Amino acid sequence: NKANLMNELGKIDRIIKREISEAPQETLLVLDATTGQNAITQAKVFLETAHVTGVVLTKLDGTAKGGVVIAIKEELGLPVKWIGIGEGQMDFRPFEPEKFVDALFETKAAPQEA
């Protein structure tokens, strides 16, 4: 069940910190951008168990505008580090906040009449 899985995740996190404490450690939570506010709820559950250092936000190539990016930062204080814009491994990109904001407010130009 969910509680057992979360306990296992916490155990893995503790063991890694104990065994290789001197190594840099990054724990990224992968969230689906199309789930909206539910992504925040999911992240809160993971934050109770593991030391999450950032987020990978997938499915930003679809209809989702990714407004959850702002909520992730504001409500949880987590940076979005990577985004997925397709289905392949080469479709992951570093998250660039400036480009993201530009894309949110981008409008398609109306066709010019001849």
Regions found by a protein language model. Give the residues of each.
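P-loop/Walker A NTP-binding module and the surrounding RecA-like catalytic core of P-loop NTPases
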Residues: N1-A114
